[in-house]
Amino acid sequence: LSATKISEFNDRVIELGNEKILPVAAIFGANASGKSNVQEAFKYMVYYVLRSFAFGGDVDEKKTKSEFMQPTPFLFDNESKDAPSTFEVYFIGDDSDKYRQYNYGFSVDNKGVCEEWLNICAKSARGKFKSIFYRNRETGELDLSGLPKKSHDNLQTSLENEALIVSL
């Protein structure tokens, strides 16, 4: 969570490169307003990133794994219940003694991964991101240009509809 310009509690702010980060975030709201759903969405995202490579494979195994693969849609809206669920995070990584900002996300539906991307903030332009990889099931696009060339063939061979690139 990025810090604002409010100067109260400056001793709690952590500086990573050009970013000022708060070490704690809070979610509050009325009963049944969705606080637990935010936590469940993060848990699902972590689980999918760590385990999606196990969702592919044998057809019989896919049937049992598919129940874990599918996120719970927002059911109070007819358009949303059939739409893909999208998960996206921004994070800061330590890259050779320089803190770099990354953007990672993916969209999934009941057929698997619809879209996946990983971007890195360009060194020269604050706030502008450069693609490390991008894939889109609908268009068939698979751009691995930000990854080492020697890994392209292995990734293309190993990649299944249900698996995320970061899980391989």
Name these PLM-found stretches.
Residues 1-44:
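Pre-Walker A-like glycine/lysine-rich segment at the N-terminus of P-loop NTPase domains
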